[in-house]
């Protein structure tokens, strides 16, 4: 099994275990005020994973991070620092924002 296959297997196992929990969190906890934020994070996720060999699994993992980021930002009343911190967490390659 090569490195990419091992990585995919690891991500699949990780995602199977936590996906339903994140789905429930997203359904019940993220309000409509976060919708525009989610669109921004969706765009960042797409840009970050478009050239990845394991892009589908990477994207699934980042979507779960996105849910957590939206919850974090919402709990901090959409503060500017909380938003920048969450965006940097999801997309650490974007340095000009921080």
From Swiss-Prot:
<dbReference type="GO" id="GO:0033650">
    <property type="term" value="C:host cell mitochondrion"/>
</dbReference>
<comment type="subunit">
    <text>Interacts with NSP2 and NSP5.</text>
</comment>
<keyword id="KW-1045">Host mitochondrion</keyword>
<protein>
    <recommendedName>
        <fullName>Non-structural protein 6</fullName>
    </recommendedName>
</protein>
<comment type="similarity">
    <text>Belongs to the rotavirus A NSP6 family.</text>
</comment>
<keyword id="KW-1035">Host cytoplasm</keyword>
<dbReference type="Pfam" id="PF04866">
    <property type="entry name" value="Rota_NS6"/>
</dbReference>
<dbReference type="InterPro" id="IPR006950">
    <property type="entry name" value="Rotavirus_NSP6"/>
</dbReference>
């Amino acid at each position: 099994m090569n490195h990419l296959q091992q990585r995919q297997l690891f991500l699949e196992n990780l995602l199977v275990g936590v996906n339903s929990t994140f789905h429930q969190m997203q359904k019940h906890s993220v309000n409509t005020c976060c919708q525009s934020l989610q669109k921004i994070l969706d765009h960042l996720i797409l840009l970050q994973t478009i050239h990845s060999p394991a892009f589908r699994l990477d994207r699934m993992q980042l979507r779960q991070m996105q849910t957590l980021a939206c919850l974090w930002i919402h709990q901090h009343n959409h503060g500017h620092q909380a938003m920048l911190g969450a965006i940097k967490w999801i997309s650490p390659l974007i340095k000009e924002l921080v």
